[in-house]
Regions:
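Mid-domain Rossmann-like dinucleotide-binding core that forms the NAD(H)/NADP(H) cofactor-binding site
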Residues: 7-86, 236-243, 247-283
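Short amphipathic alpha-helix with an adjacent loop that forms part of the alpha/beta core around
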Residues: 87-98
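N-terminal Rossmann-like NAD(P) cofactor-binding module of classical short-chain dehydrogenase/reductase
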Residues: 101-104, 244
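Helix-to-beta-strand junctions that scaffold the AdoMet/dcAdoMet cofactor pocket
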Residues: 120-121
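Short glycine-centered segments of the SAM/dcSAM-binding site in methyltransferase folds
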Residues: 124-125, 147
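C-terminal substrate-binding/catalytic core of Rossmann-like NAD(P)-dependent dehydrogenases/reductases
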Residues: 140-189, 279-282
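C-terminal capping/lid region of NAD(P)-dependent oxidoreductase domains
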Residues: 175, 181-188, 199-244
């Protein structure tokens, strides 16, 4: 792999590994388990590697992302797809799953928590890497005896807890990459580390529309690349080794997250069942 492809992985891959194999207690071995997993925000940096690890471990993966980003996920072998613009519950059920064993929410869980409560199987695991300023109605999970698992990649270093395990995880990931079981998640590469490219990369992140990972590659230089050197590659044409950079303007179909565009945030259980979950709530 190139330096950029390698640099795209460590933080997101360790996050995904810890969520799956430590927090959710899924066996960390090839085809070691079975069952199903719903991944919300599957085309992002963590999602793009997490779906690969979940498949490697033996899980059936259902990926939630904007339709424009489905080709990105399909190149990783993910073919069960749902669009976050529409209600998730009927989409997942249409794929043949009344409930799933695991749900990984890699974006603010608030807009999705009703669907999560409906779709998670009894004794299942719901994992999140994203905090929210709103209260989550976790009591909705109680009657199914569902575990809610949080993952934060800096927990170990912040509290000096089993820090050596992250180096061991990187060694496992390196072996899987060398064996071809995993692929890099780089989607955008800026050639040259300079103020303009840093501003462009930051602007990309602030749109919350990116897929995969962004890298900036040496050399360090003081001059920006010309606009013509920054090209958007349509998702349909992604190739394994293609490095694409951010366009001077955003694509028409941005990856806006459901329930957040207008600032309205809803916590409503789809079935309206009040038992142990309280009344429908709006924030």
């Amino acid at each position: 792999m190139t330096l950029g492809q390698t640099a795209a992985l460590p933080m997101t891959a360790v996050t995904a590994w810890e969520l799956l194999f430590e927090r959710m207690s899924i066996p960390a071995a090839a085809h070691a388990t079975h069952g199903s997993m719903l991944v919300i925000n599957a085309a992002g940096g963590v999602g793009s590697i997490l779906v690969q690890l979940a498949q490697w471990a033996g899980l059936d993966v259902i990926a939630v992302a904007s339709r424009v980003n489905w080709p990105w996920l399909q190149k990783y072998g993910i073919h069960k797809l749902a669009d976050y613009h529409s209600d998730l519950t009927p989409q997942v059920q249409a794929l043949g799953y009344d409930m799933v064993d695991y749900i990984a929410t890699l974006y603010d869980p608030v807009p999705y928590f009703g669907a999560i409560a409906d779709l998670i199987a009894p004794m299942g695991h719901v994992g999140s890497i994203v905090a929210t300023d709103d209260s989550l109605p976790v009591a909705w999970l109680k009657n199914k005896s569902v575990s809610l698992d949080w993952e934060y990649v800096f927990s170990k270093s912040d509290y000096a807890y089993q820090m050596a395990t992250q180096g061991q995880i990187l060694q496992r990931l390196s072996a899987l990459l060398d064996a071809g079981a995993l692929r890099s998640t780089i989607a955008y590469n800026f050639h040259g580390i300079n103020a303009r490219n840093l501003r462009q990369a930051q602007a990309m992140l602030e749109t919350k529309n990116t897929i995969g990972k962004i890298t900036l590659q040496a050399p360090f230089d003081g001059e920006a690349k010309a606009l013509d050197d920054i090209v958007w590659k349509d998702p349909q044409s992604y190739a394994d080794e293609t490095l694409v950079a951010f366009p001077s303007r955003r694509p028409d179909d941005g990856d806006r997250r459901a329930g957040t565009d207008s600032g309205q945030r809803h916590l409503v259980h789809p079935t309206g069942r009040p038992s142990d979950r309280g009344k429908d709530r709006q924030h």
